[in-house]
Amino acid sequence: MAEYEVVIGLEVHAQLRTSSKLFCACSTEFGSEPNTNVCEICSGMPGVLPVVNRKAVEYAVMMGMAVDCTINNDSVFARKNYFYPDLPYGYQISQFERPLCEHGHLDIPVNGGTKRIGITRIHMENDAGKNIHSAADNASYVDLNRAGTPLIEIVSEPDMRSAEEAVAYLKELRSILLYLGICDGNMEEGSFRCDANVSLRPAGQKEFGTRTELKNVNSFRNVQRAIEVEIARQQDLLEDGEKVVQETRLYDAARNVTASMRGKEEAHDYRYFPDPDLIPLHLEDGWLQEWRKALPELPALRRTRFMEQYGLSVQDAELLTAERELADFYEAAVRHGGVPKKVANLMMGEFMRELNERRISVNEAAMTPEAVAELVRLQEEGVVSSKIVHDIFSDLFTSGSMPEAYVKAKGLVQISDSGAIETAVDEVLAENPAEVEAYRGGKTKLMSFFMGQVMRKTRGKANPAVVTGLLTEKLG
């Protein structure tokens, strides 16, 4: 790839977490029966007038502020004209010449440092409905529940140079949306989705190459794979002396290929013009001040603070601050007396494993920050071993029990009395004379075997440090 430079820009659509749609009072609840959250406005009936959802405007502005955009006090809604069965108006209400937010940036973590990605604009628009194709009765249906749901489109500058950078940008953007509480970030349900514009140009050339737009990328993994596949496809074309066609391509995850969908539209193809049913949107300075004050501590600042305040590594801080609820949980556990690094290790290991296996969020977990802090303390004080922590964690996670009471009730308090442990050590050595001889002959890896045997005799309750000391002493 030394001969060519990759150029990537992303268009991200984020569905705003308002209770009602952008221009009417219909619910935005996901999963309702088809065509139940629909009225005359969002179904495009003639003679009705849209009214802007103030909360959606607030959310869009907060996102703009979070990425250091210029917020335009006056912006204009425009009609984006195209035909599709799930678009009841025959056009989409969007913004074109004067968007709500523009000229921002986002710093993303790259190779232990940061890289600044420019953000061209953030504008508001209403979502389309959903086409449902049924093979059983050879028919297509339209569900308008999603039609009119408020979206923001976040358009980046073409500043990314690899698929890895594109994924890092998306993850950082999603974290900000989650911290603000304005989008649930669910890529599978389509509430956070992106189109990737990919092109190649000869290394050192300033002029951009012909770009393609990639669609149907509904996970971070698929974003990376789709971009990598498209880069390879374009490189093969250029090396064979062929031209890249400007088009929209669909990513097929099963086959790991991109396929042509249609020619890539330009702005003039949509015949944008100001929507005559909506007056220009004017924002009072007082509103902007109020919304700026409501901004939380954002992921980048919190990441830096976690490293400075708690002594965490870059990787640990990145993982723990990826979602606001996870970072809040961690800090609550530390406030309850948990050693910061030990709490981090437990949360990134056992805690995250349970969340992922059960596919639940932090807020849905029965386990509390107090319980995590108490479990860390018990291990630090030698009351329980790391093995016992591993063995009981799933029960604690699902039951919400406090660790100290649980351990005592189950008789799992760690044995640290050297006399009791010495008895078990002597029995193990007496039962395994061949292994003892082999160890003394140089096969020191057998230490783990002896450790396992002693732990089995004590049902995992022996203090590992005491066991190691006694074995080392007796094996010479």
Swiss-Prot record:
Keywords: ATP-binding, Ligase, Nucleotide-binding, Protein biosynthesis. It catalyses: L-glutamyl-tRNA(Gln) + L-glutamine + ATP + H2O = L-glutaminyl-tRNA(Gln) + L-glutamate + ADP + phosphate + H(+); L-aspartyl-tRNA(Asn) + L-glutamine + ATP + H2O = L-asparaginyl-tRNA(Asn) + L-glutamate + ADP + phosphate + 2 H(+). One of its GO terms (molecular function) is glutaminyl-tRNA synthase (glutamine-hydrolyzing) activity. InterPro entries: Asn/Gln-tRNA_amidoTrfase_suB/E, Asn/Gln-tRNA_Trfase_suB/E_cat, Asn/Gln_amidotransferase, Asn/Gln_tRNA_amidoTrase-B-like, GatB, GatB_C_1, GatB_Yqey_C_2, Gln-tRNA_amidoTrfase_suB_CS. Coiled coil: none annotated. Its EC number is 6.3.5.-. GO terms for biological process: glutaminyl-tRNAGln biosynthesis via transamidation; translation. PROSITE patterns: GATB. Pfam families: GatB_N, GatB_Yqey. The keyword ATP-binding applies. The keyword Plastid does not apply. Belongs to the GatB/GatE family. GatB subfamily. Heterotrimer of A, B and C subunits. Allows the formation of correctly charged Asn-tRNA(Asn) or Gln-tRNA(Gln) through the transamidation of misacylated Asp-tRNA(Asn) or Glu-tRNA(Gln) in organisms which lack either or both of asparaginyl-tRNA or glutaminyl-tRNA synthetases. The reaction takes place in the presence of glutamine and ATP through an activated phospho-Asp-tRNA(Asn) or phospho-Glu-tRNA(Gln). This is Aspartyl/glutamyl-tRNA(Asn/Gln) amidotransferase subunit B. It comes from Oleidesulfovibrio alaskensis (strain ATCC BAA-1058 / DSM 17464 / G20) (Desulfovibrio alaskensis).
